[in-house]
């Protein structure tokens, strides 16, 4: 895997994804290899290394609005959701992303 799967694969169109939400600045899609029955990834469409390095407050608000909207839909459809982001050594792909999850972990 590259350092930035989201820029190199998803945003470039090299890896086709099932979109859940899209705006000019944010994309949400079903994870290509889900770890939960519902596993949606929400990303900014420009490269941002992590939550700790984002300096564009407008983009951060747009991203969190998308996370909130996707999570609300998951709660409506499945009764519950988790929202997760990883930092430091826990962050495999060095592109800010949030996971919106529901159900019991499947792998």
List each model region and its residues.
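HIT superfamily nucleotide-processing domains
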Residues: 1-107
């Amino acid at each position: 895997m590259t350092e930035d799967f989201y820029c190199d694969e998803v945003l470039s169109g090299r890896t086709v994804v099932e979109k859940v939400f899209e705006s000019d600045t944010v994309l949400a899609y079903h994870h290509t290899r889900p770890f939960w029955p519902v596993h949606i990834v929400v990303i900014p469409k420009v490269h941002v290394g992590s939550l700790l390095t984002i300096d564009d407050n407008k983009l951060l608000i747009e991203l969190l609005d998308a996370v909130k909207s996707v999570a609300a839909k998951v709660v409506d459809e499945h009764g519950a959701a988790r929202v997760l982001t990883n930092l430091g050594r826990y962050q495999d792909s060095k592109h800010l992303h949030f996971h919106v999850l529901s159900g019991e972990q499947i792998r």
